[in-house]
Amino acid sequence: MAVIQDIIAALWQHDFAALANPHVVSVVYFVMFATLFLENGLLPASFLPGDSLLLLAGALIAQDVMHFLPTIGILTAAASLGCWLSYIQGRWLGNTRTVKGWLAQLPAKYHQRATCMFDRHGLLALLAGRFLAFVRTLLPTMAGISGLSNRRFQFFNWLSGLLWVTVVTSFGYALSMIPFVKRHEDQVMTFLMILPVALLVAGLLGTLVVVIKKKYCNA
């Protein structure tokens, strides 16, 4: 817990030298890995702020806190392993009350978007779906429920994971290298630190609203 507090303090104070400490940065990697794994892998955790964390990772690479290739490798593994977990949920547990309950709690618009993409584009939907929050967690579950073979799924899983992580992280890095952004570096880093927290709170509140509405309608 003390290390987490140190990381938050270093981010808030823009102390990149402290963040670059090997022990501290290893915890940063772990937190990012766990967040992406859970967001991609578990339907109840689909509100976690994966995209904004990748933007933050790109900004930290620009500050020499993290290194590009190891970051891409670690976060791609997190996203792809999480996506595999989502696929396994659909393949093995798709007809259980638990998974059906998770699916029922997600907003209907994401069900419709994921179903439309999967029906129209099949596995190619995984490539585009990675860039859509909630949808990237739903699609692998739907692929598992449909009985799609693990071998075919894994190819598109790892390819889409690599594309998503590389594109969004690179965008965060490129954004941090723009002269205007460099001149307002402190404000940008503060924004990138607050954004995942704000999205997390918004996701939690949105999920609670959906759950309460469904319980009220079923009462």
Curated annotation (Swiss-Prot):
Keywords: Cell inner membrane, Cell membrane, Membrane, Transmembrane, Transmembrane helix
Sequence similarity: Belongs to the DedA family.
Cellular component GO terms held in the UniProt record: plasma membrane
Chain ranges on the Periplasmic side, renumbered to this chain: 39-67, 182-191
UniProt membrane topology term: Multi-pass membrane protein
Transmembrane parts of this sequence: 18-38, 68-88, 161-181, 192-212
Keyword S-adenosyl-L-methionine among UniProt keywords: no
Record-given protein name: Inner membrane protein YghB
Organism this protein belongs to: Salmonella typhimurium (strain LT2 / SGSC1412 / ATCC 700720)
Keyword Lipid metabolism: no
Pfam families: VTT_dom
Cellular compartments annotated: Cell inner membrane
Topological domain spans for side Cytoplasmic: 1-17, 89-160, 213-219
UniProt-listed InterPro entries: DedA-like, VTT_dom
